[in-house]
């Protein structure tokens, strides 16, 4: 039986932590673990997922939940309640439903105070890791038999009916992820016609029917070249000389978005080396299986710009293709020959210096899973027996996650992000005495997860921003500051500081709060919006150089509605509790941030959500930020338009249901199913409550709350539905904790702000 381990790790030469591994999540397989009942539940969960895999694509994340609830002997003692047709919701019924949700969710808290959860969904995360382990000869040690079994389960569970795999678990089939998944199955031991339901044969047919892997996007061309089933001359150049350009140039790496920078850093190293893994019998077989013509007859130069239409979200502009062609025809031939190859060697040396710096400052977690595998492979190419690679191996378990649909690779974990919202949801329930231990542990986790130092050495010279006082998306070891993660954690610390110490623990020291405020203030742009990781400000025209085909807006850092709104709320609360600290700066910050939210509102009254689906998510954040800054339905046209949008999109069952297609299409798309999405319903409900809807017409709120109450399960859980997270416009991300956090929070705000005033009258 698989078991989730929390905050475990032994300090040694290859594994170390800045805060004793608080927040770390790792899975271990115990062949003798679990009771007969627990094993039966897990098998039932696996079978149910398989049977419904085309209806509900995200997992319900049940394995660790079964484990935790069993360890705590949790039993829901409060009977379920339902609101009948035509019946009004009483304060008592809302309290019972909320109490049940709070009881259940509190039981899911880990020993270190955070809430574990899957944070995955993209189907290009895991295969490169498997490929990397195959190339380096560590496949069987990193992925023993039970790991391989669960990886294959995941691949089978998310194969589309047409035989392919999407960019993410809810997406249409793409060449990129179909080819990667096929290769992954073959590496893990499946034959050309093997796999459950003829998985390999169906996948290969899809690939060949759609033009073969010559039509794979650029990232796929890179990985296949590394593996040896594609040729580097069929890829666009990624010159490592980029890292030794003068800093005044507009295309300097310091001006790039951190994730773009961190992907192309190791990619350019591997490209500069023209590294190719061992050509094994399997690689030779793949060369035959993945193409519609003999491998040695392919004109590689002609396939550089070829991309399957199923993968193409961002068509490259002509200026970009001209740039690649210039580098390919003119620059690369020079840089690979004497004496210019000396410049190439210098560039490779500098690039590797940056890779090591980033690895060390993230404790070898790196900024994310795509970057992790590339940096790890680059370290192996530099020195297969070196300590750098061994340190990378020690952090692979941090990325692996097991659920009823198998083993997948996480983005890098959402521990801090989820916990920040979880604490706010629980505080809104006003059941503080009953859940004091839960709040105290959550408070401790947040305090222990704050980043306490800037990156090491001359961090600005390594293109890094301040991080002292920030919070990351995951844990302290990760090290990368994020504005909204910082703002949400800061809100928690401020709210908890107003409560009795004996109830929730020692308040965070003011100096550490000041450090957090400093980070948030530093990330505001001239237009008033907040960037996420680093200050924005590079020229927008650089997006014309976006080298990917399936993402948008990845070259430079941008401002985001959610980051801006979270930061407004945090600083308004901070100003109230610490009125003497940087007051003038904070006032200016809030005014400019409000103007940004007003400026980016869509014509239909909504706001585009960059990290959740989509206009519902963005509108909840924006309304919360505007109201916190003193805007209201009466004095703000933006608030009125936002409210009208939410009311207009409410469905007949009282909920909201927005399709993930809204994100790439940038237009509101309703779910095609009749059932509303409970997470989105909670977002919209809270957005309307922020705006004072209860005073105008509470009926839409009652209808939404009724849906949440009636959808609650027997144990106090809520059902898993459609995926609700997103990044880079076109790729969805499964936040498994959202189905608990937001319905609970929505009911808490409803009970506190809608029902209580009515009862007091």
Curated annotation (Swiss-Prot):
PFTB repeat residues: 148-189, 513-558, 590-630, 639-680, 701-742
Catalytic activity line of the entry: (S)-2,3-epoxysqualene = beta-amyrin
One cellular-component annotation, GO: lipid droplet
GO molecular function, one term: beta-amyrin synthase activity
Main EC class the enzyme belongs to: isomerase
Annotated catalytic residues: 484
Transmembrane regions listed in the UniProt entry: none
E.C. designation(s): 5.4.99.39
Keywords: Isomerase, Repeat
SUPFAM superfamilies listed in its UniProt record: Terpenoid cyclases/Protein prenyltransferases (SSF48239)
Tissue localization of expression: Expressed in the leaves and in the epidermal cells but not in the inner tissues of the fruit.
Pfam families linked: SQHop_cyclase_C, SQHop_cyclase_N
PANTHER family: BETA-AMYRIN SYNTHASE-RELATED, TERPENE CYCLASE/MUTASE FAMILY MEMBER
Family from the record: Belongs to the terpene cyclase/mutase family.
UniProt protein name: Beta-amyrin synthase
């Amino acid at each position: 039986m698989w078991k989730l381990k929390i905050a475990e790790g032994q300090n040694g030469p290859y594994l170390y932590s800045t805060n004793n591994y608080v927040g770390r999540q790792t899975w271990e397989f115990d062949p003798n673990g679990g009771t007969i009942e627990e094993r039966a539940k897990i098998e039932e969960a696996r079978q149910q997922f398989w049977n419904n895999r085309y209806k509900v694509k995200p997992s319900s994340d049940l394995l660790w939940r079964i484990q935790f609830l069993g360890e705590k002997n949790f039993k829901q003692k409060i009977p379920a309640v339902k609101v009948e047709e035509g019946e009004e919701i009483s304060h008592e019924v809302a309290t019972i439903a909320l109490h049940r949700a709070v009881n259940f969710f509190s039981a899911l808290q880990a020993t270190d105070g955070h809430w574990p959860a899957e944070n995955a969904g993209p189907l290009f995360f895991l295969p490169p890791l498997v490929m990397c382990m195959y190339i380096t000869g560590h496949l069987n040690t990193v992925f023993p038999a039970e790991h391989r079994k669960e990886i294959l389960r995941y691949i089978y569970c998310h194969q589309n009916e047409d035989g392919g795999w999407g960019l993410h678990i809810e997406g249409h089939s793409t060449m990129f992820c179909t080819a990667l998944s096929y290769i992954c199955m073959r590496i893990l031991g499946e034959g050309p016609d093997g796999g459950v339901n003829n998985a390999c044969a169906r996948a290969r047919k899809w690939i060949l029917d759609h033009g073969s892997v010559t039509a794979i996007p650029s990232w796929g061309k890179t990985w296949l070249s590394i593996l040896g089933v594609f040729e580097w001359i069929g890829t666009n150049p990624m010159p490592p000389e980029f890292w030794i350009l003068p800093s005044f140039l507009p295309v300097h790496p310091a001006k790039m978005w951190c994730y773009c920078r961190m992907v192309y850093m190791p990619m350019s190293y591997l490209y500069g080396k023209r590294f190719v893994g061992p050509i094994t019998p399997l690689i030779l077989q793949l060369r035959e299986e993945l193409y519609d013509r003999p491998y040695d007859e392919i004109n590689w130069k002609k396939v550089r710009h070829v991309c399957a239409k199923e993968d193409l979200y961002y068509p490259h502009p002509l200026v970009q293709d001209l740039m690649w062609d210039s580098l390919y025809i003119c620059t690369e031939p020079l840089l690979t020959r004497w004496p210019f190859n000396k410049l190439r060697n210098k560039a490779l040396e500098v690039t590797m210096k940056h890779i090591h710096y980033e690895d060390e400052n993230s404790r070898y977690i790196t900024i994310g899973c795509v970057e992790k595998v590339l940096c790890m492979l680059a370290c192996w190419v530099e020195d297969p027996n070196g300590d750098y690679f061994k340190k990378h191996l020690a952090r692979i378990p941090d990325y692996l996650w097991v659920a009823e649909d198998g083993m997948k690779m996480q983005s890098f974990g959402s521990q801090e992000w989820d916990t920040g919202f979880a604490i706010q949801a629980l505080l809104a329930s006003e059941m503080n005495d009953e859940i004091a231990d839960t709040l105290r542990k959550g408070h401790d986790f947040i305090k222990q997860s704050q980043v306490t130092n800037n990156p090491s050495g001359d961090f600005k010279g390594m293109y890094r921003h301040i991080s002292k006082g920030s919070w990351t998306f995951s844990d302290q070891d990760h090290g990368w500051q994020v504005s909204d993660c910082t703002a949400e954690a800061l809100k928690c610390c401020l709210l908890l500081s107003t409560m009795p110490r004996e109830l929730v623990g020692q308040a965070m020291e003011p100096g550490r709060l000041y450090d957090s405020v400093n980070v948030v203030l530093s990330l505001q742009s001239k237009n008033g919006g907040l960037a996420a990781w680093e200050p924005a400000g590079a020229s927008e025209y650089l997006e014309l150089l976006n080298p990917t085909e399936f993402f948008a807006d990845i070259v430079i850092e941008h401002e985001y509605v959610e980051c801006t709104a979270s930061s407004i709320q945090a600083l308004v609360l901070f100003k109230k509790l610490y009125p003497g600290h940087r007051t003038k700066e904070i006032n200016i910050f809030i005014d400019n941030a409000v103007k940004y939210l007003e400026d980016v509102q869509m014509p239909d009254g909504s706001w585009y959500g960059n990290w959740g689906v989509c206009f519902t998510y963005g509108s909840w954040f924006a309304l919360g930020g505007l109201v916190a800054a003193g805007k209201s339905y009466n004095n703000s046209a933006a608030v009125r338009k936002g409210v009208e949008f939410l009311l207009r999109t409410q469905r007949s069952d009282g909920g909201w249901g927005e399709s993930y297609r809204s994100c790439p299409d940038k237009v509101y798309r309703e779910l095609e199913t009749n059932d509303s999405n409970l997470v989105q319903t909670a977002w919209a409900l809270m957005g309307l409550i922020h705006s004072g809807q209860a005073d105008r017409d509470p009926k839409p709120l009652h209808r939404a709350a009724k849906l949440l109450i009636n959808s609650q399960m027997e144990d106090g859980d809520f059902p898993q539905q459609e995926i609700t997270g997103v990044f880079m416009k076109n790729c969805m991300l499964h936040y498994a904790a959202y189905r608990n956090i937001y319905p609970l929070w929505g009911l808490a705000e409803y009970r506190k702000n809608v029902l209580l005033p009515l009862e007091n009258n």
